[in-house]
Amino acid sequence: MDQRLFFPATERNRVPIGDRLKTVLPARGVVLELASGSGEHAVAFQQRFPGLRWQASDPNPDHRTSINSWIRHAGLDHVMPHALDLESSNDHGTSPAMSRTI
């Protein structure tokens, strides 16, 4: 079952946001995105900036499910770690991608 959420604003603003991020992000490293929502931005930016490892997070379990669904849909399971719940002390990023280095 497809559990991806779609937020209309993402379609409109991912290119301008990505253009701005390109001017400030390093070529390599890890980015922690707070309150990632549907996960559409996280996946788009992971694809646009392959030298970075994009770590999505969201306190809403439905959003984390959507983020992980977007990651799977984009075929980024082995590149992007699963979404984190930064409000939970039990979530330690157990995704296999977490141990990869760039």
Predicted regions and their residues:
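Conserved residues at beta->alpha junctions
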Residues: 8, 36, 57-58
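Glycine-rich SAM-binding Motif I of class I
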Residues: 39-43
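A short acidic, Gly/Pro-enriched loop at the edge of an enzyme's catalytic core
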Residues: 94-102
